[in-house]
């Protein structure tokens, strides 16, 4: 994931910062508890494609 892109990309819902999870290949919004997938190096910033996360629980690379 390009560091410059990470500096400017925000959550499409709350416009807050996203955190890159390299192992899961996801961008995480802690405020909304959503994880946006990265497919072929491209962030998929569609709410319908995001999955719910649970704070304090490791992100599952399989997306469950």
Swiss-Prot record:
It comes from the Bacteria. Gene3D superfamilies: 2.20.25.10. GO terms for cellular component: cytosol. Signal peptide: none annotated. InterPro entries: Trm112-like. SUPFAM superfamilies: Trm112p-like. Belongs to the UPF0434 family. This is UPF0434 protein Bcen2424_2546. It comes from Burkholderia cenocepacia (strain HI2424).
